[in-house]
Amino acid sequence: MSNTGTTGRIPLWLVGTVVGLLAIGLLALFFYGSYSGLGSSL
């Protein structure tokens, strides 16, 4: 496993962290919307 993919690019751990936070945020918004009745129409 060479480390050439991260050269001059965003580190993979940072990408994973951002994607994870976005996924958790979207899930939180979806559950909050469905709980408050805003997401019941989806």
UniProtKB/Swiss-Prot annotation:
Signal peptide: none annotated. Keywords: Chloroplast, Membrane, Photosynthesis, Photosystem II, Plastid, Reaction center, Thylakoid, Transmembrane, Transmembrane helix. The chain crosses the membrane at residues 10-30. GO terms for cellular component: chloroplast thylakoid membrane; photosystem II reaction center. Belongs to the PsbJ family. One of the components of the core complex of photosystem II (PSII). PSII is a light-driven water:plastoquinone oxidoreductase that uses light energy to abstract electrons from H(2)O, generating O(2) and a proton gradient subsequently used for ATP formation. It consists of a core antenna complex that captures photons, and an electron transfer chain that converts photonic excitation into a charge separation. This is Photosystem II reaction center protein J.
